[in-house]
Amino acid sequence: MESKRLDNAALAAGISPNYINAHGKPQSISAETKRRLLDAMHQRTATKVAVTPVPNVMVYTSGKKMPMVVEGSGEYSWLLTTEEGTQYKGHVTGGKAFNLPTKLPEGYHTLTLTQDDQRAHCRVIVAPKRCYEPQALLNKQKLWGACVQLYTLRSEKNWGIGDFGDLKAMLVDVAKRGGSFIGLNPIHALYSANPESASPYSPSSRRWLNVIYIDVNAVEDFHLSEEAQAWWQLPTTQQTLQQARDADWVDYSTVTALKMTALRMAWKGFAQRDDEQMTAFRQFVAEQGDSLFWQAAFDALHAQQVKEDEMRWGWPAWPEMYQNVDSPEVRQFCEEHRDDVDFYLWLQWLAYSQFAACWEISQGYEMPIGLYRDLAVGVAEGGAETWCDRELYCLKASVGAPPDILGPLGQNWGLPPMDPHIITARAYEPFIELLRANMQNCGALRIDHVMSMLRLWWIPYGETADQGAYVHYPVDDLLSILALESKRHRCMVIGEDLGTVPVEIVGKLRSSGVYSYKVLYFENDHEKTFRAPKAYPEQSMAVAATHDLPTLRGYWESGDLTLGKTLGLYPDEVVLRGLYQDRELAKQGLLDALHKYGCLPKRAGHKASLMSMTPTLNRGLQRYIADSNSALLGLQPEDWLDMAEPVNIPGTSYQYKNWRRKLSATLESMFADDGVNKLLKDLDRRRRAAAKKK
């Protein structure tokens, strides 16, 4: 009986009883895993929920019937108030259904049911069927852009890391060469007090920006501050800056120290202002509300805690009195350190303003997409977002991926999941706020691990990923809300759908207007025959690689496999040997395809094992995806520069300097290079030709 109750509770909570393992066979989930995941989401038993006449939220598609079932008995009067204030009224009998007005506009409305002195409320969300698509894509244009990790950019003026000033300059250079966008890896808030925690996919908060990307050169108060300018002219400052700029790997600690020193001095001057800039800053703070305030409070408190003990990496390692955002001690800290909190509020305003200026540049050049942002799948355990909202995040679990052939223990990403039951109980407000924050000042949003809208692999805290299970999310409602916010922000959506993709979500994503992600290396069958360019789906973005994959040179030379062997990433020599063999077959299949579809001159070699990476081969590989039927093409500057070194190696932490490798050339020299310019001109021409073939 106990077992049956547990199974029912797990099923009711959305925990799948089994999954298909790496060998294609069903694998049952243990009772212990179910018990611990229920405990993580505070759902130990299938508790009965108090019956209300209507649910707290209902989501509908515009233009379709909108039935509302009313529980209970007796007569109810109902009042529907739209977002704009229009009201509809009526009566309904409990136990029956009625249809909401068919002409309800898209948006967020409120239904109130009244019976005697009892009231019940339901948030009514009416959404379009599909996400927004820019007119250029509706006109069947084939667009291309650069996929960039902002921190990798070198320039003659930055402070050792790519910044929003570099982004602005690169947008101009890409636009002038026919490009339609720059795609960014996540620029979410990380940790100024712990700068070496540099993964953009383990952020402190997904609602705010990484202030390390502030272009200090563009901050007026930095130039107006005599103290800052005296510091700036010191030989030691210039020497440290030049070393950070010249380094091949981002030195986060040094760069952060430089920028924080300069910005602290600039803040002193700004804080004395009584002008339109101060008014704009205060207005920004007021509009962004508690979420922004607590982000700044976290950063200020984190800085103090690290000064006292550098091992206090996040709030779980702080003294207990500071672990609860609502504690009197936290309130007291904010009052006593108001200037520090204001400083971090100002940094967020600077970052927001500079990023908005980049967006304005892209629109000035009439780039059809301009900027596309990246929404990480989760947040880190010890950051601002979990500190501010302990109820929403299940801290006794983390997300990852189930076991596969290469990783028999699976992957544990160390990110606490959002509780689907809390998201629903709050009428989807956390999801809506997240989308709104990340759809600002951009024309596209890439959703990392988009399958998370259907299900996520949850792992009990402290366990390896093979002890996990899939937990389901209300995918249809989430996709509808995604479409509504996409349309409102005029922001198209790209779903990163790599890895294990459940069949049931593929059709949902396509019909919702979410663009898929097609990586050249993966677009082949078991015979290593590569998908023809014209066979790529139109509703997709084609890329050669991603931040988790080798560059073109790295792939062709199997540098990723060699490095993986050195780092001990593979279970045994048999697996590694199989990977090398598989790569050789893939290279031959790819070379055959390049010749077959006219991406290489006929004189080029036909045997992959005898062919090294050359400018001709590099160009041919990029031509292949440029010729694709995909509406979007993402190109990596690493491949323009023929780089071999990867920027990230999945499955590693301390073994490799992830998220630090810079580009091998400055922006100025890269866009002055004849080879790069000829390549981009060729690829731009082929994209235009691909559009005409339609």
Language model regions located:
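Conserved alpha/beta catalytic core and glycan-binding cleft of carbohydrate-active enzymes
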Residues: 280, 284, 409, 497-640
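Hydrophobic faces of well-ordered beta-strands that scaffold small-molecule active sites
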Residues: 144-148, 182-184, 371-373, 445, ...
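Low-complexity, glycine/alanine/valine/leucine- and proline-rich hydrophobic stretches
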Residues: 641-673
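Acidic/aromatic-lined carbohydrate-recognition and catalytic surfaces
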Residues: 39-46, 56-63, 81-85, 89-95, ...
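Acidic, His- and aromatic-enriched active-site or binding-groove loops in soluble protein domains
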Residues: 198-226, 385-409, 469-479, 514-526
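Active-site neighborhood of glycoside hydrolase catalytic domains
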Residues: 351-364, 427-514
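Substrate-binding/active-site clefts of carbohydrate-active enzymes
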Residues: 368-430, 434-437, 456-472
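The substrate-binding groove and active-site-proximal loops of carbohydrate-active enzymes
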Residues: 149-165, 246, 335-350, 412-429, ...
